[in-house]
Swiss-Prot record:
Its EC number is 3.1.-.-. Residues 14-96 form the GIY-YIG domain. The gene is slx1. Forms a heterodimer with slx4. SUPFAM superfamilies: GIY-YIG endonuclease. Residues 114-147 are annotated as: Disordered. It is found in: Nucleus. This is Structure-specific endonuclease subunit slx1.
Length: 423
């Protein structure tokens, strides 16, 4: 990791997901991957543009369809962790059953007891280990993956979302295929253990629209191609935060009632359109964690706004805050434009706010509109400079705030953790 990545961290990605592909020709053929841009990734898998995966390159299985996604990952690294665990449930520590853990503990206790009762036990084991080393080394073989049915994928996904590690993440399941959702529902109704309440199910695409499954920011995209993957999705929220914090004279924390200095302190802003609540980051997080009554919780998931009393999601606030605190150049340009208009029209007080809002809105449109993915918002190489590549859209290399790179993308080989069941 170079120094520039440490000094200039990127904003939290507005969208990152793990997806499940299904062949429209052979429904038993399934594939797992991760991406910040599901629409582009799907056309890559279908061979429309270069950059697809070897395991989805067979023409006899194309076209592929994206039937569901697990969204809500706060980084590329987090999505890769979930992707690998879903691809390799036999080796993932997150999916080890309690029975296996108990057997391992019993074996460990027996080993310790044998060592304490027999002093020569350790020497004999060392000798046997040395004899094995002297023998002919075994050739490494590719790990065999047993065939997995759709129900097996559901089971592994269900176990992952209930695991100690992933159950505290703000993850959601979004179905794009109606028959896949019906299969999930039929499978889920037979399971005794329910998913924890934070995990939401969103019906999208060809699924029937049921309002009970959606709410807040969990809106329907209408299809994979309409996924909201840029900061344009929260443009109004960013606008409001900029206006509230631009003049910090009367900005106070609604938790501690202390003065806020936005240029020196991390400040949160309520995402509700009509609420002007501002808080110190630590004050609000402490309030949310205390209200959750979960002793092991460090990062809050959601909470009640101290001003408007609406339930607000912590990840959404952190995305806006990360953009405001890390995309310095974009914010400076927006504020300079706003203040220039304020000075020109300062005499007409009734026109100042509306003109400024229109100007900022246009500027945000330029920054977050249809060309946003050609700047830095969808640069897939920014997170932690990972050397280990996955199927997860590692083939596009774009630099922040530069001219759009050519759309020709290199073909990448699947990593050893890529997964597809071709039956």
């Amino acid at each position: 990791m170079d120094d520039t990545q440490i000094e200039h961290p990127r904003p939290i990605p507005i969208f990152y997901c793990c997806y499940l592909l299904r062949s429209t020709v052979r429904h038993a053929s399934l594939y797992i991957g991760s991406t910040p841009n599901p629409a582009r990734r799907l056309i890559q898998h279908n061979g429309v543009v270069k950059g697809g995966a070897r395991r989805t390159a067979a023409e006899k299985l194309r076209p592929w369809e994206m039937v569901l996604v697990v969204e809500g990952f706060m980084s590329r690294l987090a999505a890769l962790q979930f992707e690998w665990a879903w691809q390799n449930p036999w080796y993932s520590r997150h999916l080890r059953s309690e029975e296996s853990s108990a057997l391992a503990e019993v074996k460990h206790r027996r080993m310790r007891k044998a060592k304490s009762e027999d002093p020569e036990f350790l020497d004999s084991n060392c000798d046997s280990a040395k004899s094995r080393v002297k023998g002919t080394p075994k050739k490494s073989k590719r790990r065999h993956r047993p065939p997995r049915s759709l129900d097996t994928y559901f089971s592994d996904l269900h176990r992952l979302l209930r695991s100690t590690y992933f159950s505290h993440w703000p993850l959601k399941i979004r179905f794009f295929s109606g028959d896949i959702y019906q299969s999930w529902k039929a499978w889920y109704d037979r399971v005794d253990v329910r998913l924890r309440s934070p995990v939401k199910v969103i019906l999208d695409g060809s699924c029937p629209e049921i309002s009970a499954h959606t709410g807040g920011n969990d809106t329907r995209f209408g299809g994979v191609e309409n996924a909201k993957i840029t900061y344009a999705a929260i443009r109004d929220y960013i606008e409001k935060a900029i206006f509230l914090l631009d003049d910090p004279k009367d900005v106070r924390c609604h938790v501690c009632q202390g003065q806020i200095v936005p240029t020196e302190e991390l400040t949160t802003v309520c995402p509700q359109a009509e609420c002007h609540c501002t808080c110190h980051l630590l004050c609000l997080s402490r309030k949310f964690v205390d209200a959750a009554l979960e002793p092991n919780q460090i990062v809050p998931k959601h909470g009640i706004c101290p001003a408007c009393e609406a339930t607000i999601e912590w990840p959404l606030m952190m995305k806006e805050l990360s953009f405001r605190s890390r995309a310095k150049q974009e914010l400076l340009e927006i504020l300079k434009r706003k203040r220039r208009v304020d000075r020109k029209q300062g005499a007409v007080t009734g026109e100042v706010e509306s003109s400024s809002r229109r100007t900022v809105s246009v500027d945000l449109d330029d920054r977050f509109g249809q060309h946003a993915e050609d700047e830095f918002l969808l640069d897939e190489d920014w997170w932690e400079g990972l050397a280990a590549e996955s199927d997860s859209d590692t083939d596009l290399r774009l630099k922040p705030l530069s001219k759009a790179a050519p759309k020709l993308e290199t073909v990448i080989e699947d990593s050893e953790c890529d997964d597809a069941d071709i039956l």
